[in-house]
Amino acid sequence: MKLFNARLIVFIGALLLGVGFSVPSLLETKGPKITLGLDLRGGLNMLLGVQTDEALKNKYLSLASALEYNAKKQNILLKDIKSNLEGISFELLDEDEAKKLDALLLELQGHSQFEIKKEAGFYSVNLTPLEQEELRKNTILQVIGIIRNRLDQFGLAEPVVIQQGKEEISVQLPGIKTLEEERRAKDLISRSAHLQMMAVDEEHNKDAMKMTDLEAQKLGSVLLSDVEMGGKILLKAIPILDGEMLTDAKVVYDQNNQPVVSFTLDAQGAKIFGDFSGANVGKRMAIVLDNKVYSAPVIRERIGGGSGQISGNFSVAQASDLAIALRSGAMSAPIQVLEKRIIGPSLGKDSVKTSIIALVGGFILVMGFMVLYYSMAGVIACLALVVNLFLIVAVMAIFGATLTLPGMAGIVLTVGIAVDANIIINERIREVLRENEGIAKAIHLGYINASRAIFDSNITSLIASVLLYAYGTGAIKGFALTTGIGILASIITAIVGTQGIYQALLPKLTQTKSLYFWFGVNKRA
């Protein structure tokens, strides 16, 4: 009999893999590591609601802005262009331009699907219901991507950003320790960073302070807060351009050595910016960020180059965060913090300590029982359990999985599952030995008889783990992940690994005079 057999080689390979990839996580050395969840590490957990209705409004606003700009270029006379949640509406003043208008709408439609209604020169344009639903879904995905991008630029390690429900997003930020870090992270995540250039309604702005939002709406305008001057300012409702055309944003210092955010527009945005400023010298244009006016300077001359600045008495950190938000892209819909929980690092450490005590304590008790009851067979089973634990840690580290408190519970459960497998195998071997059969036959029949039951129970548990991971959330996923990995590891260690060890030891086992030493049982008299 060869000392090294295929099963033993697989077991040794699993041991080396497990130890090799577990070391970085256990000893904090370089290499792939397990990410500790909030409940173990401490940090900030937020549940965000995405207001997808606003994404639809912004879509119609952008469409109205593009329609107004291109209609003027093509000398198509339009009147009363209005935009709301239902779509955009306007009047075509010259019916002879209908074909040109239809061609323009077809061009603006792009890959979207419009519903266009015409009646006596009055038009209404809106997205189809299917297109609206698709827009809402894409908005959630876009917001998730932007949040991840911002957090990466902010320098936060291992943030978790996932969709939860239809229009909600769960954000977990391990390692947030101070109130200042919490505030900055919350502001960075919740800021829409929706940049717009809007014309001041010079005709009616003098009455802005006593005007209501409804009165402004009837004028085709909108009332916004003026950060620079205080009070309200009246702007034309249809923006000149928006942040979709922004290509870069960075912190610079003005002539007073105050931090401001400089932004750059793409070629299309620069052209629109230049055309508008050239045609409106002497009038004011407002720089609007998240529905707040940061400045509304008078246009002195045509502004070329497609760049501008946002100032607002920012600190360096605030200006830096704003630049990050602008660079990562504007959210097409604002978000609202629905729930916020802070888990302190001390609580996380206590959780880790308690979990490790439970795991190690349970492991020692199990090992003690196995050795006392099954003798050397119990020692072999304990070796398989150790390899099982190393494999769980290694696989989670390789894939960058997050270990949570429920995940630790899953590992403890896995120890029990792996022990069950070894108990079944040892009992089947002992049953055959009690029938005065040889050791080689007892081991062979023991594994054959036990494997079927082990596979059946483990496959059932594995299916349950997969379903829990697929349809569960947060804590449930953590539990399902470690349980699933542990089940697969237990199959390798219990069925393949221990059998390989017995095959290697078989020459010695067949010559033994003490079955009790090896299996804790004597042959039947």
Curated annotation (Swiss-Prot):
Signal peptide: none annotated. It is found in: Cell inner membrane. The chain crosses the membrane at residues 8-28, 356-376, 379-399, 405-425, 453-473, 478-498. GO terms for molecular function: protein-transporting ATPase activity. It comes from the Bacteria. It comes from Helicobacter pylori (strain ATCC 700392 / 26695). One of its GO terms (biological process) is protein transport by the Sec complex. The lineage of its organism: Bacteria, Pseudomonadati, Campylobacterota, Epsilonproteobacteria, Campylobacterales. GO terms for cellular component: plasma membrane. Forms a complex with SecF. Part of the essential Sec protein translocation apparatus which comprises SecA, SecYEG and auxiliary proteins SecDF-YajC and YidC. Keywords: Cell inner membrane, Cell membrane, Membrane, Protein transport, Translocation, Transmembrane, Transmembrane helix, Transport. Belongs to the SecD/SecF family. SecD subfamily. Part of the Sec protein translocase complex. Interacts with the SecYEG preprotein conducting channel. SecDF uses the proton motive force (PMF) to complete protein translocation after the ATP-dependent function of SecA. Gene3D superfamilies: 3.30.1360.200, 3.30.70.3400, Multidrug efflux transporter AcrB transmembrane domain (1.20.1640.10). Its main location: membrane. This is Protein translocase subunit SecD. It is a multi-pass membrane protein. SUPFAM superfamilies: Multidrug efflux transporter AcrB transmembrane domain (SSF82866).
